[in-house]
Structure formats: C-alpha cells, structure tokens
Amino acid sequence: MKKLIYKISLFAGLATVLISCADDFLDKPVYGVLAADDYFKTEEELQEGVFACYDVLQWAYTTDWNSMYVVKSFPADETHAGGGSDGDQPSYQQLDDFSYTAENKPIEHSFKTMYFGIMRANAVINIAVGDTPAKVQMIAEAKALRAFFYFELVSMWGGVPLRLALPGASEFALEKSTPEQIYAQIHKDLDEAIPNLPKKSEYSPEMRFRMSKGTAQAIKGKAYLYQKKYPESAAAFEDVITSTEYDLAPDYSKLFLKESEYGLESLFEVGYNITGYDWGNFQWGGNRSMENNINWQLMGPRGDYYTTGTSGLLPGWGFNYPTAKMAQAFDAEGDVIRKNACILSVADLRTKYGGDWIVDKNLDWTEAPPVWGMEGYFRLKYGSLKSETVASPGVAELNYGTNIRLIRYADVLLMAAEANLLAGNVSTAQGYFTKVRDRVDLPVKTVTLDAIKTERRLELAFEGFRFLDLIRWGDAAAVLKNQGFKKNGNFAEKHNLYPIPSAEILNNSKMTPNPGWGN
C-alpha cells in the first residue's frame, strides 16, 4: 500500500464529481470531468476507487491533531493526555477527563472520516459492474470496508444515518437508523463480501493491506460480540482460526515495529510511509495526502525534559503518557514480557540506558510543578522509536512510518475465548485464552470473564480498544472514576456513546443528538 497509495490522488476529486453528477441539477454539460456512470469501467479505474477507500483509514487515524486513535484511547485508564500543560490541545484534555462536548474536533473528525469512507465505498458498490473476477473481488473489498466503517460508527455513536447510495440533492438530510439496522447492514455486506475475498496468503506481500476473507470474518465476529450474539460470534471467529492463515508471532516485543508489518499475526492494518518530510514540506491542517504517522511524534517523551541514552526512544511532544495504574496492572499479573515491551519507566531509563528525565529526580510525580500527565512511564509500544523513522531525507520527527494494527490474531483469540465462554463452550474458550498467555510465559489460569477482561487489558494495551471494551462490558462507570491527571473526571451515562458532532446536526436537519448530549 505504501507505494501504491499515491495512485489514489487520481481519485481524489472523483467523489465530489460523483455526487454532483448524481444530483443532476445542472442542465448544461460539465466539461473536463467524468460522469459517474462513465467511471470504474476498467479494472485499473476500479482499483483506484477501492484504494481510495483504504486511504480514508490513514486520514482517520493520524491526521495531525485530529485522530481516531486519540478519540478511542484517551478516555480509557491506560494513559493521560499529557502535553505541555492542561491547556495544551484542549480537545485532548477533554477526552482524558470526560469534559468533552459535541464541539470536540477529534470526535468530529472521526465521525466525518467514516462517512468519507462510506461515500467512497458506495461509489464503487453502486457504479461498478462485476464483469471480471478481479472486479468481483474489488466490489467485495468495498462492501467489507463499508461494513468496517459502519462498525466503527455504531460501536462509538450507536444509531447513525444509514447511507447506502450516492445521495441526491434532496437526500442529504437523513434520520438515524437504529443500531439493529446498522448491524443488519454490516452483516449483509460481510456475507456478500466473504465468498469473493481472497485469503491473506493469496495476496502478494505488497497487497496485504487489502481486505482478506479472514479480515471480513473477524469483523463479523466482532460485530456479533458487540451485539451479545455469542454463538454467532464464536462461529465467525472459528472460521478465522481454522483457516490456518494466522498465528501468534513468537516475539511480542517486535509486534508493533515496522519489521513486523503485515506479518503472521496481522489481519488488518493502516499503512504508513517514510516519505522524507521536513519542516518546509510537511502539510499541517488535515491534508489527506500525508503518508506518515505523525501520532508517534506527538506522543513521544517531551523533549524539554528528556534524553534518550541508549533506549532508542526518541523525544517527542509529550502526549499520551502511560498511567501508573497501567504499570501496576502488568505487575499484578506478573506480566514481565508485555510490560517491558509496552512501557519504560524513568528509573529504567536512567539505570539501564543512561538517559534522563531532568525533573522529578526523586521519582515523586506529585512534585510541583509536575510534568503534565506524567506518572513515571513512557510508551514503548507504538513509541517514538528510532527504528521507526528516518532522519535523512527529511527530519526524524516527521517521518514515522509505523502501521496501526486494527485487527490482529491475539485479539481474535481473546474475542473468540469470550464468545465461546459466554456461549457455554468453556473448554474451547480455555484453549484460546491459554494460547495468548503462553506466548508471554504466563502460567495456566482458569478462564473466566474477569480473566479475559484482564488479559485484553494487558495484551491490547495502547491499541485503542480498552474504552469500548469497558463500555460493552458495562464496567466503564465503575472503572473510569477520577480520570484525567487532576483525577477530577468521571464517566457518566451519556458517555456510553460519543456525542454526535454539532457540525453534523447543523448540516443534517434530521439528525438528533445522542442521549444526554443536548437538544
């Protein structure tokens, strides 16, 4: 994807053209553009359209300060927002302490980008004709991607407008569909896509960013799990597991490095590029052509106070510091391997790597004035690591190329364990649960729902799943108390769903706020 994604720029203006042509509100011919029905005739054109759907994932997850990764991660208890102070990036601080509103820009960005992806997928699905095997496959990819985009929406916002075609001028105002209707469409799209998708092994290495049969089956299993349809969820995950296409990578510490991208454990990733950006050519402001993962620079140890030593962890801009609670969770389980792969303490930075953090010399994180959000730990997992960027051409700060892992096999095994346990298949659940723990040398433990909850917290730390897990388990109100660095934020009933962005309500006269978020 990292090489091929540049071709997507050929498609960049097409979506607007498609809608304009579909509206048919001009009675004069428009010269220099293609009518909607004249596109996607060739396999090359269709590939450009499908790749444009994948491109939305880059834009959604790492567009400078507006990132779906941030929206999913910061409300959980894994990290603090951090930054220079409580006034640095207010939208981040609001996510951290539950003071966010329908005006929050990262939330708005996340909602908007999912509909950009849906719009692009709809163009492919509604216009392309599957008259060759390659076209049939690409239409299936678009359906699976549309299902993924809608799953992100329904799991975060609940009922949302269900748009399945390119809207005419009178159709932009659309009321919410129910969550049940959204899930029904997700399963319909996946059921139609799965028979026509290749296995992961049938893709060439450079094409493994694309939807595979196993990816779609995993999305299906996850959707059923969120619906609490446990036998159906277990069956979908079983299709992934018995395919023999995937396994656990042997070394957890290397899982989130560039060297492991699209590897043995990977089902679905957002691909990024090392592109030689410098301070003169980096494009801030949500430019959709950006190819790098700027998030990791935003979230590296704040360079004002930090020296690397031999740790390999480069300085950044100080957001997303791990909480002490997260470190304590690893310790409580005796989970040395994953702790060492995920976080680095200030004490170890000094004693093992010869680096330094020039404040809090006594390791007392309450010393005044404290570094905002800092409780003694840095992230190594998805960290600002020297191995993940280049300093020439360009500058190291702007060229992180680490992919975001959206679905990986350990997550599938833990979701399968949960679905099987709650469906009454205890021995199957035990096997999948134990397999994940074996990889990191943890002793055999009886599988229970509480044990799975703990295992997901540790295995999937900093991957953006914790907050939605707590919500679907009904644990968020009990766990997410005294949140934020000031310990003054609390999860409330309304936080079970993110707010519908104010801009969406303004632009769609039939849109209504989510419960508790205003009139």
For each feature predicted by the language model, list its residue ranges.
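An aromatic- and glycine-enriched ligand-binding surface/loop that stacks and positions planar moieties
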Residues: 22-85, 191-194, 210-363
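Flexible, polar/acidic helix-loop-strand segments at domain edges
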Residues: 92-99, 325-407
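Conserved, well-structured interaction surfaces
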Residues: 43, 47-61, 65, 85-157, ...
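Long, intrinsically disordered, low-complexity segments
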Residues: 20-25, 40, 54, 78-80, ...
